[in-house]
Design a protein with these regions (language model features):
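Catalytic cores of the polymerase beta-like nucleotidyltransferase superfamily
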Residues: 1-170
Length: 172
């Protein structure tokens, strides 16, 4: 196991020991399912930002309004985000407000099904509310919900879509 993943698993283990739900989330799960080594590991949790900062001694509060705290482990930085719903988007990039929620509701706000999968490295189980694993197998990039709305919310999503489509259709 690479050192980044090992540190992420330790963070998740500590959150779970404290009674919180915690998973690997997003692109790192997608990459692992593709057999690739992720560049970074994001963590999604039921812990609120103030709980995250009380559990871990080395943190940076960079996006607390959005439920994101950076946890430093073994000189590596990990985004640890509270499960959330996003409100309306004000600038084509960031939601005006967020409310903390459940894993299923958190998945519904994400961009593409292949990025909407959680993985619990402690139990070795995938949590997939949007059939993202099937889309990875079929090499399909599909928006979660209404694609037009997803692209309007965040103006970088069409770029992400193009990048992901290029990856999915390349010849091996």
């Amino acid at each position: 196991m690479d050192s980044n993943k090992a540190a992420a698993v330790e963070i998740i283990g500590k959150l779970q020991e404290e009674g919180h739900v915690a998973y690997l989330a997003g692109g790192c799960v997608r990459d692992m399912l593709r057999g690739e080594t992720p560049k970074d590991y994001d963590i999604a949790t039921s812990a609120l930002p103030e709980q995250i900062t009380s559990i871990f001694s080395k943190t940076r509060e960079v996006g607390v309004h959005f439920g994101v705290v950076i946890v430093i482990k073994d000189n590596q930085a990990f985004d640890v985000a509270t499960f959330r719903n996003d409100g309306s988007y004000k600038d084509g990039r960031h939601p005006e407000d967020v409310t903390f929620s459940t894993p299923e509701e958190d998945t519904a706000r994400r961009d593409f099904t292949i990025n909407g999968i959680f993985f619990d490295p402690i139990s070795q189980k995938h949590i997939d509310f949007v059939d993202g694993r099937s889309d990875i197998e079929k090499k399909v990039v599909r928006a979660i919900g209404d694609p037009d709305l997803r692209f309007q919310e965040d103006h970088l999503r069409p770029v992400s879509y193009t990048h992901l489509r290029a990856h999915e259709t390349r010849e091996d």
